[in-house]
C-alpha cells in the first residue's frame, strides 16, 4: 500500500512539477503570453501580405487576360492581312503573265 502511494506520488510529481524554490510560474506565463502576442502579430502581418499578394495576382491575371485577348485580335488581323496579300500577289502575277504573253505574241 505504501509502495502504491509512493508510485502515485512519483507519477503526480512527474506530471505536475511543483517548483522547488516556491516561485510561481507567473514569469513563465508572462514570457509565453509575450511570445503568443508576437506570434499573433506575425500572423496578422502575414495575413496582410497574403491579402496584398492575392490582389496583385488578381491584377496580373486581369492584365494577362487582356494581353491574351489583344494577341488573339492581332493574330486574326495578321491572318486576314496575309490572305489579302496572297490574293493581291496572285492577281498581280496573273496580270504580269497576261502582259508577258502579249509581249511574246508581239515578238512572234
UniProtKB/Swiss-Prot annotation:
GO terms for molecular function: Atg8-family ligase activity; identical protein binding; protein-macromolecule adaptor activity. One of its GO terms (cellular component) is vacuole-isolation membrane contact site. It is found in: Preautophagosomal structure membrane. Its main location: membrane. CDD domains: Atg16_CCD. The keyword Membrane applies. Pfam families: ATG16. It comes from the Eukaryota. Keywords: Autophagy, Coiled coil, Membrane, Protein transport, Transport. It is a peripheral membrane protein. One of its GO terms (biological process) is cytoplasm to vacuole targeting by the Cvt pathway. Signal peptide: none annotated. The keyword Electron transport does not apply. Residues 28-94 form a coiled coil. Gene3D superfamilies: 1.20.5.170. Homodimer. Part of the ATG5-ATG12/ATG16 complex. Several units of each may be present in this complex. Stabilizes the ATG5-ATG12 conjugate which is necessary for autophagy. The ATG5-ATG12/ATG16 complex is required for efficient promotion of ATG8-conjugation to phosphatidylethanolamine and ATG8 localization to the pre-autophagosomal structure (PAS). Also recruits ATG3 to the PAS. Involved in endoplasmic reticulum-specific autophagic process and is essential for the survival of cells subjected to severe ER stress. Belongs to the ATG16 family. This is Autophagy protein 16. The lineage of its organism: Eukaryota, Fungi, Dikarya, Ascomycota, Saccharomycotina.
Amino acid at each position: 500500500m505504501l509502495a502504491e502511494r509512493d508510485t502515485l506520488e512519483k507519477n503526480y510529481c512527474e506530471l505536475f512539477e511543483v517548483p522547488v524554490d516556491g516561485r510561481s510560474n507567473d514569469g513563465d506565463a508572462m514570457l509565453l503570453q509575450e511570445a503568443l502576442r508576437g506570434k499573433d502579430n506575425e500572423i496578422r502581418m502575414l495575413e496582410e501580405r497574403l491579402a496584398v499578394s492575392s490582389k496583385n495576382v488578381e491584377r496580373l491575371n486581369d492584365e494577362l487576360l487582356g494581353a491574351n485577348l489583344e494577341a488573339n485580335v492581332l493574330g486574326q488581323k495578321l491572318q486576314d492581312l496575309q490572305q489579302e496579300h496572297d490574293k493581291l500577289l496572285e492577281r498581280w502575277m496573273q496580270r504580269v503573265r497576261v502582259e508577258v504573253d502579249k509581249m511574246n505574241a508581239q515578238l512572234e
